[in-house]
Amino acid sequence: MAKFIDPDKLELEDNVVAINRITKVVKGGRRLRFAALVIVGDKNGHVGFGTGKAQEVPEAIRKAVEAARKNLIEVPIVGTTIPHEVLGTFGGGKIMLKPAAEGSGVTAGGAVRSVMELAGVADVTSKRLGSNTPVNAVRATFDGLTQLKRAEEVAALRGVSLQHLAE
């Protein structure tokens, strides 16, 4: 069970990744609604995403930001990158995340770049496989980020010392 992260104790920035116009055809014509996908993060190891739907764009964004603040995760960061390579999946989308050398920057496109920058990961390489819709990309990225573990956690799970793990 992931521990709750209080969004009120963090200085969160938000970034709108996608806005979709949804049309429902009814007897009297078309009903328009908007769906927004938003990423929030403190650029210091905490990031979340949320979606919101409403009749107007600003209201959809507000709902998405609220949802994102309730859906925060902690990302383990080693220096300026992630601890190890990981493959996140959601639906038909896959995201491969690899640690990168310091100074190489975020090599990722669109939604994945946004997640990494708001999480505070400065150096990472990614490859998007399969479905490339923004929602699938974000959810697959979050799946990958939740799989990340620090060396201390791995050593504790295996019941060995950190020195033994390094060898």
Swiss-Prot record:
Q: Which residues form the S5 DRBM domain?
A: 12-75
Give the family from UniProt: Belongs to the universal ribosomal protein uS5 family.
Q: Which PANTHER family does the annotation name?
A: MITOCHONDRIAL RIBOSOMAL PROTEIN S5
One of the protein's GO biological processes? translation
Organism this protein belongs to: Levilactobacillus brevis (strain ATCC 367 / BCRC 12310 / CIP 105137 / JCM 1170 / LMG 11437 / NCIMB 947 / NCTC 947) (Lactobacillus brevis)
Q: Any idea which UniProt keywords this protein has? A: Ribonucleoprotein, Ribosomal protein, RNA-binding, rRNA-binding
The domain of life for this entry's organism is: Bacteria
Q: Which GO terms describe its cellular component?
A: small ribosomal subunit
Kindly give the SUPFAM superfamilies that the UniProt entry links to this protein: dsRNA-binding domain-like (SSF54768), Ribosomal protein S5 domain 2-like (SSF54211)
Which HAMAP family does UniProt cross-reference here?
Ribosomal_uS5_B (MF_01307_B)
What is the protein name stated in its UniProt record?
A: Small ribosomal subunit protein uS5
Which InterPro entries did the record assign? Ribosomal_Su5_D2-typ_SF, Ribosomal_uS5, Ribosomal_uS5_bac-type, Ribosomal_uS5_C, Ribosomal_uS5_N, Ribosomal_uS5_N_CS, Ribsml_uS5_D2-typ_fold_subgr
Q: What is known of its domains?
A: The N-terminal domain interacts with the head of the 30S subunit; the C-terminal domain interacts with the body and contacts protein S4. The interaction surface between S4 and S5 is involved in control of translational fidelity.
* Assembly mode: Part of the 30S ribosomal subunit. Contacts proteins S4 and S8.
Primary role: With S4 and S12 plays an important role in translational accuracy.
One Gene Ontology MF term? structural constituent of ribosome
